[in-house]
Amino acid sequence: MKKNKVVKPGYLFTTGYTNYVFSLLFLLYMFDYIDRMIVGSLFPFIKADWGLTDTQLGSLVSAVYWAIVALTFPISILVDRWSRRRTIGAMAAVWSLATFACAFVGSFGQLLATRTLIGVGEAGYAPGGTAMISAMYPKEKRSWIMGLWNASIPLGSAIGVALGGIIAANWGWRHAFGIVAIPGFILAILFFFAKDYRTVDLIKQKELEDGKVEKKKMSARDMFNEFISKPALMLTYFGFAAMVFVTTSLLTWLATYFNRIYDIPMEKASPKASLVMLLALVGAPLGGYLTDRWRKRQVNARLLFPGLAALVAAGITFLAFSVFTGTEQYIALLFLGIVITSFIPGAAAATQDLIHPGFRATSYALAIVVQNLLGASMAPIVIGWISDKTDLGTALAILPIFLLVAATLFLTGAMFYKRDMSTVEEVPMEVRH
């Protein structure tokens, strides 16, 4: 057998093919967020054209998350029970087409509709990608790989914010949508031909008195209990929501904040804001690496670390928006860009650790529903509404409250982690060509 055909223990594919699939998943997630977040840097240009309020501008971001909330759960069931490869490829094609359509809209209503369609396409990608990564790599490396993969979120957001402001300032905001949509089509086609893992049967095992193991198909009640009976899992979902409220607020409004507070032109404010987001390229992988190292000594590290990261982020955010100004403020925000995303790998891995392998996409979908319903979909509008009533600086100054809530939820969940882990069944994964 050739060396490059050897599948290492704990891996689903060979090393080379694992890297190829991971690269596709990384690039797809990056363009997911480029297409999703580019609109934030286009706010001043769209506002100038159509005279929109901050609340209306915020709704252009929230619309994506409303669609995700509505559809991510049913689509994740398709991912778990049908095919990761086909659903991911189809979703990427839909969100890329919708982004391209944004370049041709003629009114706020039409733009809101196309932004909603982007959310339709993106609804099941994160659950699908998370399930693929959980299957491809050993459990011991799950946080680290999740950290690397989730680094595509700030990278895509930063590229979207930076490119949006630059393209709009030179060629108009419509061109920004059209240009960033094209790569997603190419990646969608490539993923249609990727390998997948065999769909996992929903089987429950029970040890009998004679030592034999009885296997039976899960009932609807068994499926429901697989989630609701685990406090650590439930608290992780809500901790995600509180953190995502803060990160979405910053992704949406930070460039506009620099523009309004410091009178910096958007073509300069956008790259300045994007650098804060780009530092999450350090935060997410670093958080995953540290979490997995800590987990060797502390089994519940995948929730302890997010809790501590949220506490530190709360302090930095308070200093940035309530104490510091100018250079001191920007330095604090750069540190925040690292710390605030370091929670993601551990929390994302926890949603996979604590559930039957046949429900991995569904588990992360529930995390997305909760975080988008209570966090991402609310944040742009809430911050925009407070900004309309007061000012943008006052609106962003409330963010530490949400970080303290997140810390409380994660640290409480850590208390139940070991017990909940002991109830999860191990199921070997097989390749589907």
Question: Which residues does each PLM region occupy?
Answer:
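Juxtamembrane intracellular "pre-TM" segments in multi-pass secondary transporters
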Residues: 5-14, 198-236
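Symmetry-related core transmembrane helices of the 12-TM Major Facilitator Superfamily/SLC fold
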Residues: 175-192, 394-412
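Extracytoplasmic gate region of multi-pass secondary transporters
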Residues: 39-40, 231-285, 344, 348, ...
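Helix-breaking motifs and short loop linkers at transmembrane-helix boundaries and internal kinks
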Residues: 51, 83, 104-110, 138, ...
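Conserved MFS/SLC helix-loop-helix module at the cytosolic interface between two early adjacent transmembrane helices
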Residues: 70-106
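Structural signature of the two symmetry-related core transmembrane helices
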Residues: 86-100, 302-317
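Helix-loop-helix hairpin linking two adjacent transmembrane segments in secondary transporters
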Residues: 149-199
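Cytoplasmic helix-loop-helix junction between adjacent transmembrane helices
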Residues: 114-155
